[in-house]
């Protein structure tokens, strides 16, 4: 079957085998695990799942079932509640349908005909509202059929290696004011080995889930009385963040960035000038003060623009680099909130560079060097993608072309590889997205570098050039981590909670065997704190083994056990959990070791 053609590609458009008419411009897609093939297989598997659900729950009505990264889902309505325990039953029915080797066929009707055909299906009517006028394609397999643009595999025999992964709720059309539908997620591959490998990764991901580990490590919490998407940083989490912020602050200053702070609340007039009001309002929070509209900032750029405008600028001042740990708020629908990965309040390691056009390439390359240093420090591989003009954007095509080409030239001249995300740019300019790969080979979008000619024009920014003429600067928007929340969540999962020593909330656990050893433990803790190292003395009246297990569960990098011998000799029994070794050191030797651990990292 690996040599079977399941679809065709026409540039970036996929076409099913039924639509093939000997067009030599079409490229065959074979039954394998290529990106294009998996899209067709997973799309078809979503329909197979829907067919199985319809067979088991005849009253079921279906909304949409798209392919997503690593799988697919289907939103539908049933009378009874479907739980995780029901997935095996649905999978069994899917296997029966796959083994039946049903042909998958396509036919087309006018939109009016489809509307009449599904007159008694309100969810189909909802789908029709989202489809442009013209012919509507319907795919049919056995007794099941559904609206779909396709393409699909030609027969259900190709759908043998799948797994339904979870059940969730989803608002109709993502609208919190509409009804809640049932959503089942799944995945599929062309062979059993690839499926099993993926399922192993899923199981490992569950163990590494930052929400689970964050609770075990007492890093952060969420509270319904406070609200969804609003993380509460506990003491350990605050220490972790503080260490990360301190290291980044120093790294920015060494690279010539000036610390600034903009207000969190700005008049709506400022957001109207910037274009956020027209292009980003649905993602913002607004309020009234003294009968005037204000918006809570979703980005830090307007505040930095006003700081630029607070003084007369000369070409000699450029590039001018401002940075801040800016707290921003963005409206996210409750259904997409997910731990620290998707929140409504977060802090960006945000910077804006105001420079002359001739300095763009140099500044972009400097930022890329900064990115590389940071990613290597945390053990991340990464790749880059240039995101171009979206449908909803400000500025003319010429300005966008200049900005996009500036990014491409900077990457090309360094021989750096990158992909293109057509239409993925911010509304005010193209950007380079930094996508990191974690220990489970998952890709995460974190940092961005954006070239912006539009906001300097809208706010009439100026500098005086060498000929004493007024010129408009270019503005580079830049975040390397993206947000502290998201980056910390990714880092926790990447390290399975075993955070690098230099940012671990508690770096050393000090475990006195008995009450007689507490004073020595406190003495060590004080010495470590003077070095900027956080430790905790485990002084509860518990067994030695329980104290050590507690420290291990908290993922503390180093554990010191203190008994009579250690007190007498001014030594420590060290368990280095990262190096996976145990040894006895003098206290001075241990202090030297911790200093070396801290000095290993240079941003």
From Swiss-Prot:
Main location: cytoplasm
Cofactor, how bound (note): Binds 1 zinc ion per subunit.
A biological-process GO annotation: threonyl-tRNA aminoacylation
TM ranges: none
Presence of the UniProt keyword Nucleus in the record: no
GO CC entries: cytosol
NCBIfam families, per database record: thrS
Protein name stated in the entry: Threonine--tRNA ligase
Gene name tied to this protein: thrS
């Amino acid at each position: 079957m690996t040599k079977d053609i399941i679809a065709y590609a026409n540039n970036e458009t996929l076409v099913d085998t039924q639509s093939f008419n000997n067009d030599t411009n079409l490229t065959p897609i074979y039954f394998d695990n290529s990106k294009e093939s998996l899209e067709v297989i997973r799309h078809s598997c979503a329909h197979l799942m829907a067919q199985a659900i319809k067979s088991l729950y005849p009253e079921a009505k279906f909304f949409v079932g798209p392919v997503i990264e690593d799988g697919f889902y289907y939103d539908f309505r049933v009378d009874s509640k479907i739980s995780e325990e029901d997935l095996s039953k649905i999978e069994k029915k899917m296997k029966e349908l796959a083994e039946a080797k049903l042909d998958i066929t396509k036919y087309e009707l006018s939109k009016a005909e489809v509307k009449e055909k599904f007159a008694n299906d309100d969810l189909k009517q909802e789908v029709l509202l989202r489809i442009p006028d013209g012919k509507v394609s319907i795919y049919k397999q056995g007794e099941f059929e559904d609206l779909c643009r396709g393409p699909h595999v030609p027969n259900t025999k190709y759908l043998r290696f799948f797994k339904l992964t979870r059940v969730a709720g989803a608002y109709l059309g993502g609208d919190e004011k509409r009804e809640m539908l049932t959503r089942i997620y799944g995945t599929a591959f062309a062979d059993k080995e690839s499926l099993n490998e993926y399922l192993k990764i899923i199981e490992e991901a569950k163990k590494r889930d930052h929400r689970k580990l964050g609770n075990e490590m007492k890093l952060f919490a969420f509270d319904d009385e406070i609200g969804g998407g609003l993380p509460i940083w506990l003491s350990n989490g605050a220490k972790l963040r503080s260490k990360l912020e301190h290291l980044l602050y120093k790294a920015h200053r060494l690279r010539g960035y000036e610390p600034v702070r903009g207000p969190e609340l700005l008049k709506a007039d400022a957001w109207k000038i910037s274009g956020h009001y027209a292009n980003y309002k649905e993602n913002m929070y607004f309020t009234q003060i003294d009968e005037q509209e204000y918006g809570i900032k979703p980005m830090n750029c307007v505040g930095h623009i006003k700081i630029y405008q607070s003084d007369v600028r000369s070409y000699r001042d450029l590039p001018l680099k401002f940075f801040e740990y800016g707290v921003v708020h963005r409206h996210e629908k409750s259904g997409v909130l997910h731990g620290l990965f998707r929140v409504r309040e977060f802090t960006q390691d945000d910077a804006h560079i105001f420079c002359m056009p001739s300095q763009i390439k140099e500044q972009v390359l400097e930022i890329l060097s900064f990115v590389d240093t940071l990613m290597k420090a945390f053990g991340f591989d990464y790749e880059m993608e240039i995101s171009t003009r979206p449908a909803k954007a400000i500025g003319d095509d010429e300005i966008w072309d200049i900005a996009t080409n500036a990014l491409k030239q900077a990457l090309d001249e360094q021989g750096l590889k990158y992909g293109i995300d057509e239409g993925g740019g911010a509304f005010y300019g193209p950007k380079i997205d930094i996508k990191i790969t974690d220990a489970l080979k998952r890709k995460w979008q974190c940092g961005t570098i954006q070239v912006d000619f539009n906001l300097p024009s809208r706010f009439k920014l100026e500098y005086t050039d060498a000929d004493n003429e007024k010129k408009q600067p270019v503005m580079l928007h830049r975040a390397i981590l993206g947000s502290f929340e998201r980056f910390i969540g990714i880092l926790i999962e990447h390290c399975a909670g075993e955070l690098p020593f230099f940012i671990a909330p508690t770096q050393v656990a000090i475990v006195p065997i008995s009450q007689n050893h507490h004073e020595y433990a406190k003495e060590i803790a004080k010495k470590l704190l003077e070095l900027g190292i956080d430790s905790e003395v485990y002084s509860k009246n518990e067994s030695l083994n329980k104290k050590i297990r507690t420290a291990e569960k908290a993922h503390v990098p180093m554990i010191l056990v203190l008994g009579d011998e250690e007190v007498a000799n001014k030594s420590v029994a060290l368990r280095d959990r990262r190096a996976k070794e145990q040894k006895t050191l003098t206290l001075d030797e241990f202090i030297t070791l911790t200093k070396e651990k801290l000095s290993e990292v240079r941003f």
